Amino acid sequence: MTRRMNFRSKKAARQRGDAMKRIGRILLCILMITVLFGISIVGNFVVKSENKSKEKKRTAIAKEEMKEWAAPDEETLKYYDLGEFSTTLPVIYMNTKGQQILKENVICGNIALLDGNEEAQSVSAVPNSIYRATIKYRGASSYSKFDKKQYRIKFYKNSKENEKKVSLAGMGANSEWVLNGPYLDKTLIRNKLVYDLARELNGWAPDTRFVELFVDGKYQGVYLAVEPVTNGESRLRLAEFGLLSGETAYVVNRDRIDTGTEEIETWGKTKGYTYNALYIRYPSKNKITEKQKEYIKNDISEFEQVLYGENFKDKRTGYQEYIDMDNWVDYFIINEFAMNYDAGNLSTYVYKELGGKLQLAAWDFNNGFDNYQWFHTETDRLYTVENSWFDRLWQDENFREHVCERYVQLRKTTLSDEHIADKIASYQEKLGDAVDRNFKVWGYSFDENLLAGTDKDGMSRNIGSYEEAMKQLTDTIRERLAYLDKELGGN
C-alpha cells in the first residue's frame, strides 16, 4: 500500500515537473517573440531613420558632384535678356561633356534635377540630385526641320549596365524618359492637354510635367517631360515572363518605314489593308526570342484576318474577341477630338497583357487641332475612320454605337467645355513667365512660315504671337466639339 502511494506521488511529481517545463518553454517562446518583435520595430525605425537621413542628404547634390553639374551660363542668359531668373517649374540640367548629341546613337553624360515645389527658385540654385544618363535626339520631322530638339534620356547608376529608376519631376520612378520640346506648337500645351484628358479614359496614357531645360548651361526653354510607352511599375505593368510556347505580353508601334528595329510583317500589311511598319518595342530586342517574335506576328495577323474577314461583326467570333472595346472606343474619341490625322497609321502604340486583349495607348498630339505643318485639317470631318484597322471598325454599326454612346457620356465629364477650359487655364497659370522666357529663345519661330496652306477663311495658318496661338487652339476646339456633337452626339 505504502509502495503504491510512493509510486503515485513520484508520478504526480514528474507530471508537475513536465508541466513546469512546458510552461517554461512557452514563456521562453513568448520572450523570444517579444525580443524579435522589438528588434524588428527598432530595425524598421533605424531603416526609416536612415532613409529619412538619406532623403535629407539628397536635398542638394554633394560638393564632389558639383563639377558634374552644367550650371546656367551667365553669358547666354544675358544674351537672351533673361538674367538669373527664378521659376516654379522643375529644372533639368543636361551635361553632354562636350559630346555632340546624335539621333542614331546615345552619348553618355549626366543630368541634374532641381525639383519644382510651387515656390520660385533661382535656376542657379544647387540641384537636388544628379545622375549618369544616356542622351539622344528623337523624332521624325521635328528632328530634321526644327531647331528645338526632342530628347530621349535614360538614367543609370554607376555604369551603363545598371539602370536607375528616377522620379522625374514627381512622376512615377522609371529609367526612361522623353523630353518633348514644343516648337511648331506655339501654345506649348497641346500634348499636355490631350495626355491629361486621355489619362481619365480607359487604358494607359503618359503622365507629363512642364519643365525648363538647360543643355550644357544654355537655356532651351519650356519642355514637357513625358513617360514613353514602355513597360514598368509606373507604366504599362505587363508581365515580364513568357510561356514556353512563345506567348508573351508585348508592345508594338506603327510608324514610318525604316524608323525602328524588330519590324514584323503581319497579314494586314502583306494584303494591303494596313500602312507603314509595325515594330516590336517590348520585349526588348536584347531579350526577345524568335518564338516570341513569331507569336506576336501571328497574334496580330490573326486579329487582322478576322477584322477584315466576312464575319468580322460577329460578337462571339469576330474582332471583339481580340480587342478591349472600351479602350479602342476611347482611343478613337480622344484622337478624333484632337483631329489627329495620324491615329492608326503613325505614332500608334498597341499593347497586350499575357492572356489579355489588344489595347491602344495615346501618343503624340503636337500636330493636333489643325497644327500639321503640311496642310490644313478641317474641323468638320472624321480622320481616324480612314486609317489602319479603324477603317474596318467603322463599318460595324455596333462599334459606331459604342463610340456615340461613349461620346455623349464624355461630353458631360472629360470632354465638357468647362473641364477643358479649366485644364487650359491651369496650364497657363502653371507656365506663367516661362512662356515669355521660352519665346525669348525661340521667338524667331513666329517669323518662319512653318504651316503650309491657308485656313478656312483663306488666311495664312502661320501664328504671329502666343496670344494668337492660344486663340487658334481654343477656337479650333470649340468648332471641333460642335461638329462632333452633331456627328457623334446625335445633335
Q: What is the meaning of each model-derived region?
A:
Residues 151-154, 175-181, 188, 212, ...:
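Structural recognition of the beta-strand scaffold that forms the well-ordered cores
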Residues 122-124, 146, 164-166, 190-191, ...:
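Short, solvent-exposed loop/turn and secondary-structure capping segments
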Residues 159-160, 204, 218-330:
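Internal "kinase-insert"/substrate-recognition segments embedded within catalytic cores
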Residues 183-203:
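A conserved alpha-helical element in kinase catalytic cores
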